[in-house]
Amino acid sequence: MSVRIGHARVAASAHWSVAALAALAWGASAAAPAGAADVDAQGTPPLRIVGDGIPEPLTATAGDAARGRALIVARASANCVLCHAIPDPALRFAGDLGPSLAGIGTRLRASQLRLRVADNLRVNPASAMPSYYKVAGLDRVAAPYAGKPILTASEVEDVVAYLTTLR
């Protein structure tokens, strides 16, 4: 007997691995089927989730930590500081709704950070934090933003680069 996990079929077993259970819960598969589309309907490459993260960067170029910091503190874009405090004495009025980002680079790997920024609802469906790169399935979006991610793939990588410096 086998069960389907995403596009993959795996043998049913009384002994499931943590990764298999996570993939089942998140609807992810370890590998996409041959001929799978390289982009979704909105032109956004699909996220390849493995275990509890996205191991591969979303872009061919490395993220820039300085640009990532600018995005995190920018009230008009990512606006992370609305809910999260960061260890920056120059920053005033950071939020405390979400966890502090101080030391996040020691607590989470880049792959885990990438998933949380790109599609946080996969990690915590009850979270108020938006999925910054996901567009599919979002139904309460203002018309000018419909079908567009909050952050581009390179901006996600910039944010991840900055978060990994917070040790």
Question: Which sequence ranges carry the predicted segments?
Answer:
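N-terminal secretory signal peptides that target proteins for export/translocation
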Residues: 1-13
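Bacterial N-terminal signal peptides
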Residues: 16-29
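Boundary at the C-terminal end of the N-terminal hydrophobic targeting segment
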Residues: 30-41
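Electrostatic cytochrome c docking/interface patches
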Residues: 41-75
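Sequence context surrounding c-type heme c attachment/ligation sites in exported
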Residues: 66-81, 92-95, 146-154
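The canonical Cys-X-X-Cys-His
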Residues: 68, 77-87, 113, 129, ...
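Gly/Gly-Pro-rich "capping" loops immediately C-terminal to redox-active cysteine motifs
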Residues: 73, 85-119, 128-142
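C-terminal capping alpha-helices of c-type cytochrome domains
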Residues: 122-125, 132-167
